[in-house]
């Protein structure tokens, strides 16, 4: 109980807290293998794999479809109690993804606040809150997660985006290095970034918790940043009603039709290219079969 109370106190004060070790070496190895399998090829046509929406990261969406351990991680008692204690009982898991950060030396991802709720809707009322759970799948001694302590402590909207915020002195920033399996919670309303330089590729998971009643930003939903949560239903066997609710199983279904704007201008030529590739593959296999029969 003292661990919960102390961690919650730090989280409320600083906006970020490093959690005690929760993942066994065997569990970590399984998670690493499943995650790396998604980095072998890009998601394309019938392939499952990674997506790339910026130059420095290979994104792996829907990690709850990879292995049961990815579902069990956010359900660990300390994590569940901290999330509910910081937010409220209505909160549930809304995103579960990860990415490989490629090596870089520039400040490609400066200090920023996440844009996820609709700023117009909450212009005259208290802003909604969320929490993110980070998990390093590799040892991290460069390109670490950085957070400006206390920058989450405001009730009105802070400026989102990367060009609003100047550099902050190191003594105000929590930088999280650590071994594979390192876990931390943070409020994305606070200023945060991936530090630079990042000297080697590294993999990490991020889970996002917030209430289903929050009105989301269109920039969040229509630029490929927010993916509806998918889960392998076989991983849910044996879970309690409370655990299922925390994974978002009991929330109302969304009626919105996704309208992803990313690469929208290229959708027609990309569709033509994929169909042409499939057609070429069909004729190649047909000709090869005839040649082999001779």
Predicted regions and their residues:
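Non-heme Fe(II)/2-oxoglutarate
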Residues: 190-191, 195-294
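Active-site rim elements
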Residues: 67-72, 169-173, 194
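Catalytic core of non-heme Fe(II) oxygenases with the double-stranded beta-helix
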Residues: 107-175, 216-221
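A structural signal for short, well-ordered beta-strand segments
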Residues: 96-98, 133-135, 205-209
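Short, solvent-exposed loop/turn segments at secondary-structure junctions
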Residues: 23-25, 98-103, 116, 138-142, ...
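Conserved metal-binding segment of the jelly-roll/cupin
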Residues: 177-191
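Non-heme Fe(II)-dependent double-stranded beta-helix
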Residues: 1-13, 20-122
């Amino acid at each position: 109980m003292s661990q919960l109370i102390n961690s919650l106190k730090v989280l409320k004060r600083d906006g970020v807290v490093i959690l005690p070790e929760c993942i066994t070496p065997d569990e970590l190895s399984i998670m690493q293998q499943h995650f790396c399998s998604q980095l072998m090829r890009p998601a394309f046509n019938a392939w499952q794999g990674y997506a790339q929406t910026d130059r420095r990261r290979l994104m792996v969406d829907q990690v709850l479809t990879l292995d049961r351990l990815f579902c069990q991680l956010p359900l660990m008692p300390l994590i569940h109690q901290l999330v509910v204690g910081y937010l409220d009982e209505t909160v549930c898991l809304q995103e579960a993804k990860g990415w490989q950060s490629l090596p870089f030396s520039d400040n490609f991802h400066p200090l920023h606040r996440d844009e996820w709720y609709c700023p117009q809707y909450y212009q005259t009322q208290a802003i909604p809150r969320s929490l993110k759970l980070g998990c390093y799948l590799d040892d991290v001694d460069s390109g670490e997660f950085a957070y400006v302590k206390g920058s989450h402590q405001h009730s009105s909207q802070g400026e989102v985006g990367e060009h609003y915020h100047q550099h902050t002195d190191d003594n105000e920033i929590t930088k999280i290095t650590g071994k594979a399996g390192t876990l931390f919670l943070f409020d994305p309303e606070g200023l945060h970034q991936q530090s630079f330089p990042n000297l080697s590729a590294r993999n990490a998971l991020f889970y996002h918790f917030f209430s289903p009643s929050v009105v989301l930003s269109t920039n969040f939903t229509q630029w490929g940043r927010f993916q509806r949560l998918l889960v392998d239903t076989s991983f849910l066997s044996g879970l309690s009603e409370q655990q299922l609710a925390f994974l978002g199983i009991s929330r109302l279904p969304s009626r919105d039709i996704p309208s992803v704007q990313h690469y929208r201008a290229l959708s027609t030529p990309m569709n033509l290219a994929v169909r042409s590739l499939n057609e070429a593959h069909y004729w190649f296999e047909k000709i090869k079969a005839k040649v082999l029969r001779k």
